[in-house]
Amino acid sequence: MADNKTENALSSDATEVRAQKLKLLREQIGDVYPAHFHRTMTNAELGAKYESLEPDVETQDVVTVAGRVYSSRNSGMFMDIHDASGKIQIFSHKDVTGEEARALLPMIDIGDIIGVTGVVRRTKRGELTINAQKIEMLTKSLLPMPEKWHGLSDIELRYRKRHLDIMTNEDSKLRFQQRSKIVSGIRRFMENDGFMEVETPMLQSIYGGATAEPFKTHHNTLKLDMYLRIAPELFLKRTLVSGLTDKVFEINRNFRNEGVSTRHNPEFTMMECYWAYADYEDMMDLVERLFEALALSIHGTTEFDFGDKRLSFKGPFKRVPMPDAVKEATGIDFLTIKTDEEARAAAKAAGFAVEKDWTWGECLAFIFEEKVEATLIQPSHVTHFPKDISPFAKEVPGEPRLVERFETYCNAWELGNAFSELNDPEEQRRRMVEQLEQAHARGEKEKQLDEEFLDAIDQGMPPAGGLGIGVDRLIMLLTNAPSIRDVILFPARRNKAD
């Protein structure tokens, strides 16, 4: 819960003064919140155009800019205004500024948005400045701003009042600008690689494509219970069956009614794609090319810092089969273990607390999570997953207990998950029925078999590689963000009263 003292500091007697000024402004100038204002350039464009202007030089160029007032000195003689691109200094003086504009100065507070027209100059100290001839009030702010150089120190308040966080925290602002660049970069990379972007339903009458608890709602007209999707997988595969394209992808939100942590948000962004006539090794190459391109676009190099670690997105990444990784970490050779009972016994003998009904594959995956995940700091592909936990992947030739699946890890986080996709309709049905029975045994009575998907697979899906990438976690790494809530503009949070 946010500190009430911190929040109360944003509401003081200053609000009364601002309200009084607003009343006076309405009387004096009429519309304090005009519908339109024409500026001739942004602050960044201004800075770029006059980058070579020497100190103590005044031009004859008249420009019009707009922005929020971040600082005011000498009774408004000097003001810094910021737009989304940067800041510019405004100078007001009786020798250059009209009487009407100077009369407005006492009514301007930190946080107000103003428009300024004037002549460009650079001061003796080298500060690019506009000598204000005309000043217009565009938005009167009724609340004081947090102090620019300290921002919001209360973390929960930063998430709840993200507008103030970005307004006063350059790191936060840059991170969300980079997020936009990364998402655009993913889309551009996929399109340049020949993938077609599609949009699949967010509301689904049958949820599937992953094992997770869904959010449930109800469609009144259709008289139908529906679910926010937990994954787009089944619809994207149906698109592949259709022949619309051989390479399909989607960037969109998934929803899972589960826990919240520094790496989990109930609403999160995924990039999921399917590539006909490819397999999981092709998807590994795709991941490496994509990650390298994104690192270069953000950092100009494939190496970058995350916390105290130096990470490299330069391919090829390390590739290790899960049974080999577990054997190296624990000495347990799962490939020589024949039965579920033997697997549970071996795990218990090594000190792992496993459930009495766990299968060979569940024991292998659990020990991997306990002993290996935390060691995967540099980007790595973990391959050869147990079939028990991978219902949509093809078997590894010669080892029917394992499938052609990999997960990409970095900083001990799972970033991506990919398969050589199962397209045998009889085997697909058998595995989905088995998965459904397991879900019902866990008490998930609403889980249903997606017959429309199975009908599409019966029609014939080409061999394909499939991949899902957690976009938020990837952005965390690329922007050095310690929490997923630092890269989601408005993350899930408790109500203020809680």
From Swiss-Prot:
Name the Enzyme Commission number(s) assigned to this protein: 6.1.1.6
Q: Does the keyword Kinase apply?
A: no
Which BP terms from GO are recorded?
lysyl-tRNA aminoacylation
Report the subcellular localization.
Answer: Cytoplasm
What molecular function does GO assign, one term?
A: lysine-tRNA ligase activity
Could you tell me the keywords of this UniProt record? Aminoacyl-tRNA synthetase, ATP-binding, Cytoplasm, Ligase, Magnesium, Metal-binding, Nucleotide-binding, Protein biosynthesis
What are the binding positions for Mg(2+) 1 in this chain? E407, E414
**Comment on bound cofactor:** Binds 3 Mg(2+) ions per subunit.
Q: Does the keyword Flavoprotein apply?
A: no
Highest taxon above the source species = Bacteria
Query: Which positions make up the signal peptide?
Result: none
Q: Pfam families, per this entry? A: tRNA-synt_2, tRNA_anti-codon
Quickly give the catalysed reaction.
tRNA(Lys) + L-lysine + ATP = L-lysyl-tRNA(Lys) + AMP + diphosphate
Q: Which cofactor does it need?
A: Mg(2+)
Listed GO cellular component terms? cytosol
Instruction: Enumerate the residues binding Mg(2+) 2.
Output: E414
Protein family membership:
Belongs to the class-II aminoacyl-tRNA synthetase family.
Quaternary state and interactors: Homodimer.
Name the UniProt record assigns to this protein: Lysine--tRNA ligase
Organism field: Rhizobium etli (strain CIAT 652)
